[in-house]
Amino acid sequence: MTIKTIEGTLDARNSRFALVVSRFNDFIGQKLVEGAVDCIVRHGGSEEQIALYKCPGAFELPSVAKKVAVSGRYDAVITLGAIIRGATSHYDVIAAEATKGVAQVGLDTMIPVTFGVLTTDNLEQAIERAGTKAGNKGFDAALAAIEMVNLYQQV
């Protein structure tokens, strides 16, 4: 028995991407944006295929991502930001709602929506995941978006 395997390729040449980034913890967000843009360009895309939307914080990411997704102008939405644990339970609420909200946007709109939002215990961990020791999670989120766009085109 031969099973047909369908998977996405890593070709960004003919796709349009919206980056939706939280301005809270902006210097981390900017590093994630740089990683996402680098990924798209390395995989055949260009900066002309990318639009950058900035929102106040991680809680606003899902609503902006949905507005962008339903516009029909983009093949994928890449959400980026950093939620860093503080002394109160605010972190848990924002991290959970941002995660659930972004996931729901993908289900509601049926276009790829990826999650490049860091949820870390401290600033050092966020810096590590925004381009130092642990790679750049913005790059990773863009890579997933590229693959998902190409997979969706085959379904």
From Swiss-Prot:
5-amino-6-(D-ribitylamino)uracil binds at F24, A58, F59, E60, A82, I83, I84, F115. One of its GO terms (biological process) is riboflavin biosynthetic process. InterPro entries: LS, LS/RS, LS/RS_sf. One of its GO terms (cellular component) is cytosol. It comes from the Bacteria. Signal peptide: none annotated. GO terms for molecular function: 6,7-dimethyl-8-ribityllumazine synthase activity. The keyword Transferase applies. The keyword Isomerase does not apply. Its EC number is 2.5.1.78. The active site is at H90. It catalyses: (2S)-2-hydroxy-3-oxobutyl phosphate + 5-amino-6-(D-ribitylamino)uracil = 6,7-dimethyl-8-(1-D-ribityl)lumazine + phosphate + 2 H2O + H(+). Gene3D superfamilies: Lumazine/riboflavin synthase. Pathway: Cofactor biosynthesis; riboflavin biosynthesis; riboflavin from 2-hydroxy-3-oxobutyl phosphate and 5-amino-6-(D-ribitylamino)uracil: step 1/2. Coiled coil: none annotated. Keywords: Riboflavin biosynthesis, Transferase. (2S)-2-hydroxy-3-oxobutyl phosphate binds at A87, T88, R129. Catalyzes the formation of 6,7-dimethyl-8-ribityllumazine by condensation of 5-amino-6-(D-ribitylamino)uracil with 3,4-dihydroxy-2-butanone 4-phosphate. This is the penultimate step in the biosynthesis of riboflavin. Belongs to the DMRL synthase family. NCBIfam families: lumazine-synth, PRK00061.1-4. This is 6,7-dimethyl-8-ribityllumazine synthase. It comes from Prosthecochloris aestuarii (strain DSM 271 / SK 413).
